[in-house]
């Protein structure tokens, strides 16, 4: 959850203290974004791309950035042309953590009464699949943000960690919960209690990351995956995502019941009929998303 002066080189730490806001970037909706860049990608503009854009602060997650991220996610969620979303940062950092300057003077009463960080998990409620394309540091809140996504692709130099313990606190945006589910208790406990990072290779071996690519190819590969997902029925993709995510919240019996209900629900869609008809007729399905 924290952007770490204790873990990053001193030069990076000083940058976090003296960061200047980047120029405003204009989104297709007309909104002015200060901390992110957004655009549509893919042959049919079916992929929404969101890039975190606080490079001097190693994409530290300030409140303004999270608010803009949520706004962009909601815009892509409502866009019928977009079937999947890619979230990325820069080559040096996906996100080095939360903005410590915004946290330093907070009190328990303030955090509790304001439900501090409660709006960080909006990304988990987006129905369209979100792919995190992680280059460089994904530490603290940056690691938590990546884990909120549905798929994680990593650049070969990526590093993941939950080093909040070095700042005298613990993860507060799901780090202890999602990391444990992703990599198991032993490795998660070690990372949380020591603040140590793991490489992209170790993250893949542990199950946190699905694929690793060269730094310069990462975003392109994530967009290709998103485009492939977007070519399927959007309503059925949403059902599939819901069913997989339920595996982390339900017992096996409950999860199987939900899966069966969602499976039956696909038979109420035109896309299920089209998909099976196309298979029998040996042609490509033409999904209409209903």
Curated annotation (Swiss-Prot):
Name of this protein: Enoyl-CoA hydratase, mitochondrial
Gene Ontology terms for molecular function: 3-hydroxypropionyl-CoA dehydratase activity; crotonyl-CoA hydratase activity; delta(3)-delta(2)-enoyl-CoA isomerase activity; enoyl-CoA hydratase activity
Keywords: Acetylation, Fatty acid metabolism, Isomerase, Lipid metabolism, Lyase, Mitochondrion, Phosphoprotein, Transit peptide
Phosphoserine: residues carrying this PTM: 114
GO biological process: fatty acid beta-oxidation
EC number in record: 4.2.1.17, 5.3.3.8
Originating organism: Mus musculus (Mouse)
Pathway, per record: Lipid metabolism; fatty acid beta-oxidation
Residues that bear N6-succinyllysine: 101, 115, 204, 217
Main location: mitochondrion
A cellular component annotation (GO) from this entry: mitochondrion
Residues with PTM N6-acetyllysine: 101, 115, 211, 217
Modifications the protein undergoes after translation, according to the UniProt entry: Acetylation of Lys-101 is observed in liver mitochondria from fasted mice but not from fed mice.
Superkingdom field: Eukaryota
Site for Important for catalytic activity, residues: 164
Keyword Protein transport attached: no
Reaction equations catalysed: a (3S)-3-hydroxyacyl-CoA = a (2E)-enoyl-CoA + H2O; a (3E)-enoyl-CoA = a 4-saturated (2E)-enoyl-CoA; (3E)-hexenoyl-CoA = (2E)-hexenoyl-CoA; (3S)-3-hydroxybutanoyl-CoA = (2E)-butenoyl-CoA + H2O
Protein family (similarity comment): Belongs to the enoyl-CoA hydratase/isomerase family.
Role this protein plays: Converts unsaturated trans-2-enoyl-CoA species ((2E)-enoyl-CoA) to the corresponding (3S)-3-hydroxyacyl-CoA species through addition of a water molecule to the double bond. Catalyzes the hydration of medium- and short-chained fatty enoyl-CoA thioesters from 4 carbons long (C4) up to C16. Has high substrate specificity for crotonyl-CoA ((2E)-butenoyl-CoA) and moderate specificity for acryloyl-CoA, 3-methylcrotonyl-CoA (3-methyl-(2E)-butenoyl-CoA) and methacrylyl-CoA ((2E)-2-methylpropenoyl-CoA). Can bind tiglyl-CoA (2-methylcrotonoyl-CoA), but hydrates only a small amount of this substrate.
Annotated localization: Mitochondrion matrix
InterPro entries per UniProt: ClpP/crotonase-like_dom_sf, Enoyl-CoA_hyd/isom_CS, Enoyl-CoA_hydra/iso, Enoyl-CoA_hydra_C
Residues at which substrate binds: 98-101, 141
Record: transit peptide: 1-27
Quaternary organization: Homohexamer; dimer of trimers.
Gene: Echs1
